[in-house]
Amino acid sequence: MEKVLAIVGPTAVGKTNLSIDIAKKFNGEIISGDSMQVYQKLDIGTAKVTIEEMQGIPHHLIDTKTIHDRFSAADFKETAQKLISEISQRGKLPIVVGGTGFYLQALLRDLELGGSNEDRNQIEAIRTELNQKENDELLSILKTIDLATYENIDRKNRRRIIRAIEVFKVSGQKMSEQQMQPTAVYDDLLIGLNTERSILYQRINHRVNMMLDAGLENEARWLFDETKVPQANKGIGYREWQDYFKNEKTLSETIELIQKDSRHYAKRQLTWFRNKMDVNWYDIIQNPQEQAKIYQKIENWLGVKNELER
């Protein structure tokens, strides 16, 4: 069974820096587990790792799609599985890093996402029908067929709502039930980063301000001008600008909304990982010494003794 290390947790807790340190110490390559970092030219709002920050560590599933492309959990799972095999064959450690919980669960627990052509044709027909409905109607359908998913889903994420309904209609099984019956396909270790909520929220607010200083408004305007419909336009940090660009919100209201949505997303990320996956949690923000504990945990899992200082 191939080994896979995953670094998970909410936004703004230091996953990127830790993953690069770990990759350097344990001969790893990094696979992005973020649903937005696949998109080219969306660098600021996705907090995409820079070439300098990579420090020569190979990174995968970054800048592989245009903003007009769809990128689903099924696409991620299929591509990441191939990457894991290739990285393992090179004698390196695959390290999946990100906060998109469903993508990671689909990969590590082999969730059935409708991979056959027949399934995909059926999904397309269902999706066409569902796309004609208003959000309130979709939520009502989801509440009827899968209350557990309804209670935890992001009400603003139309794509995820439709996906949850599709799963039920194609498989006859609730998404929430499917996620409760995981099948391990890798020898995986999940390292989770988190910190005290007030500190986390301060870091999120600060990160949004840094994104604004780096040019987030211009990046979002470019995306808005390019197209009004793609999946990429639905991400946090981008979707909030639409009313501002239509002169329906002020700049300060838009910034406040991005910060609010980001905080809510972080809360949902934590809930997901705590409820759906077996994660080993650490707080390296308040307790930097815990990073050494993470290295020890990885060493024990790998069954090797790795020199921490090289």
Curated annotation (Swiss-Prot):
Encoding gene per record: miaA
Residue span of region Interaction with substrate tRNA: 34-37
UniProt entry tagged with the keyword Transferase: yes
Gene Ontology MF terms: ATP binding; tRNA dimethylallyltransferase activity
Residues where ATP binds: 9-16
UniProt xrefs under Pfam families: IPPT
Cofactor dependence: Mg(2+)
Catalytic activity entry: adenosine(37) in tRNA + dimethylallyl diphosphate = N(6)-dimethylallyladenosine(37) in tRNA + diphosphate
Membership in a protein family: Belongs to the IPP transferase family.
Keyword Manganese: no
Subunit structure: Monomer.
Full protein name: tRNA dimethylallyltransferase
Enzyme Commission no: 2.5.1.75
Function: Catalyzes the transfer of a dimethylallyl group onto the adenine at position 37 in tRNAs that read codons beginning with uridine, leading to the formation of N6-(dimethylallyl)adenosine (i(6)A).
